[in-house]
Amino acid sequence: MSQTYNVLIATELKGIGEDAEKEMAMRLEEHGFEKIPTLSSAWEIKCDAEGESEAKDQAIQIFVNVCRTYPFELRMVVHAGTSQIIRRKKSFEA
């Protein structure tokens, strides 16, 4: 049975321009992410999934698909519920 999970993604964006970062933030919001105002680069999204791992995978997939159009290095920490925290580092080329 599917449940709704709140997935937290904290990021570090290396080598991205200010305009590209603003555009990316707007696109993330269009895809259901909500910016967490207390941290400079943290996002939350609600995902319907069978478990916490699936919810984190969905959130990562959406986040990466939005980001991959910009050339920069993305470092992220992803967490949902009580399961293990996922750490990822990805580089995107122009």
Predicted regions located by residue number:
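Short, flexible, solvent-exposed loop/turn segments with mixed acidic/basic and small polar residues
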Residues: 1-2, 32-35
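A mid-sequence interfacial segment
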Residues: 84-94
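Short, surface-exposed ligand-recognition loops at beta-strand->loop->(often short) alpha-helix junctions
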Residues: 11-19
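Short, intrinsically disordered low-complexity segments
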Residues: 34-84
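Generic recognition of short, well-ordered alpha-helical segments
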Residues: 19-23, 58
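Short structural boundary motif marking the start of a folded domain
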Residues: 3-7
